[in-house]
Amino acid sequence: MRAAAAGLVVLLLAVLRFDARDAAAPAWPVTFTDVGREAGLTRPTIYGGLDRKRFIIETNGAGVALVDVDRDGWLDLLVLSGTRLQDGARKDADYAPADAPTSRLYRNRRNGTFEDVTDKAGIRRTGWASAVCAGDYDNDGGIDLYVTYFGRNVLYRNRGDGTFDDVTREAGLASEGVRWGSGCSFVDLDRDGLLDLFVANYLRFDLQTAAEPGAGANCTWKGIPVNCGPKGLPTDTNLLYRNDGKGRFVDVSEQSGVARVTGRYPMTAAAADFTGDGWIDVYVACDSTASILYRNNKDGTFTDIAVESGTAYNEDGNAQAGMGIAAGDYNNDGLLDLVKTHFADDIPALYRNLGKGLFEDAATAAGLNVQNRYVEWGAGLSDFDNDGFADLLYVTGNVYPEIEQLLERYPHRGPRVVFRNANGARFEDVTAVSGAGATTPHSSRGAAFGDIDNDGDTDVVIMNMNEPPSLLRNGYSGGNGWIQVALEGRTSNRSGIGATVIVTAGGVRQARAVLSQSSYYSHDDLRAHFGLGSRSRVDEIEVRWPSGQVQRLENVEGRKVVKIVEEK
């Protein structure tokens, strides 16, 4: 009887706790449902050990990409994969060819399901993949893919039909020896209409000589032995390749100044006009060190201005474990802001753009200091409820699976944290009322944002460590308007990468960047998405092309994809 009464009390307390939480949560018309399995995304993404990560190479995971590879108007899906180490050994596990882990390409069937076309597309490859960036580097109309690895990076040229050729060597991008490629971005550094390529290198790592967990000062966390690094491991340098327009890339890392920025552990790289001068800059989130903002000097060289711009450290002046980047205009002032995700016991940085290349970290003032026990990875500033303000979603997952057995506060698997944008002033945590797609725990890394089903709202695809990917369908239930802008460059690169699109509707001004990489090691829908609230039309669409040209359209009807071709 006492047991039954105690059970009733526990049940009542649980109900009261749920009711109190639910009552306190703001009204939120968005529910995320993970439809990955129903959509055909059933293959687990292999990445390192299940219950223990012996070496840092097993921890970082990889990105995903939403990209229309076959030009049918529907987003296809690339999920990067790692592999495993042999038990007790310092080498990759052996697999039969048919069973070997591989990155996978899924073709959108346009009916809510995807077909695995990995082999047909020519991208089967086993290894420790990191990041993907996308763009039409040869301006032939097909989106090409660049994938970084621990080992050898790969450039896949799109044949135009969603199949690919590995052209790494003939493009001049084959590297000697083993390097750990991390973030990358296609970027037109010199306004010649050709996409150049920025590539970050995380650190120098030798599996044969790597220290065991607990074997040094940088091999424990909260007194518990864990895999070593990144602190204490040697750093590497970043690379910049100039597109020569003949199918090859030329290494200009030294003369451009990119390789001169040293002593960092760079991760995700996002390229856009962050300083507002019409030239494309590169922002790099760095792990455990100051982040980098490469300002384009307009002469083929770059200077790191992260410290003076306010984007190197957090609001307390500390370096953070920078993982992912979300770029967008959260306060609707027409300027591109930045969110940078971090490690447990920290909060995201929210770099509010003040104009003229200056930023301030407004994370605490904006209400982002409420979740700090999770390791944060892929992130996106996307208007999930189409009310005209960019919301925030980031995925979580610890790098030490063994920790949760000793420290319950730091679970290996965590939620997808969702913040509603409250009119550009503050963010409100709505994770608990965003559906099982948000609250079900996973150890996630990359996330890509885009309209997978072409219904006018933003969905999310997520890389999960040693699980199948998640496909979060946005079940927005309201009637707010929207518009999407697809670009085709003529003087600029054909894919429009690096452009900033500004939409004005009813006095509300919103900016979005067209990015080759963002989130965590991932690539989003190239179509710029804008919520319009109660409005059905936009007063003006302004495109700031990477060529420097500014183009405007007026009085445009909403609820559709508007294609804008650059004027010559």
Named regions from a protein language model:
Residues 102-108, 237-244, 295, 352, ...:
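Beta-propeller blade signature
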Residues 32-35, 113-123, 163-174, 247-259, ...:
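Blade-edge beta-strand/turn elements of extracellular beta-propeller
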Residues 80-98, 201-233, 394-411:
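Short, conserved, GDST-rich strand-edge loop motifs in beta-rich repeat architectures
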Residues 41-63, 99, 121-133, 173-185, ...:
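Repeat-based blade/solenoid architectures
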Residues 60-71, 107, 128-143, 157, ...:
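Beta-propeller blade termini
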Residues 28-31, 39, 49, 366-367, ...:
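Gly/Ser/Thr/Pro-enriched helix-cap/hinge segments flanking short amphipathic alpha-helices
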Residues 74-81, 140-149, 197-201, 281-286, ...:
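Hydrophobic beta-strand segments that make up the repeating blades of beta-propeller
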Residues 117-137, 142, 148-189, 199-231, ...:
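Asp-box/WD-like beta-propeller blade repeats and closely related beta-sheet repeat scaffolds
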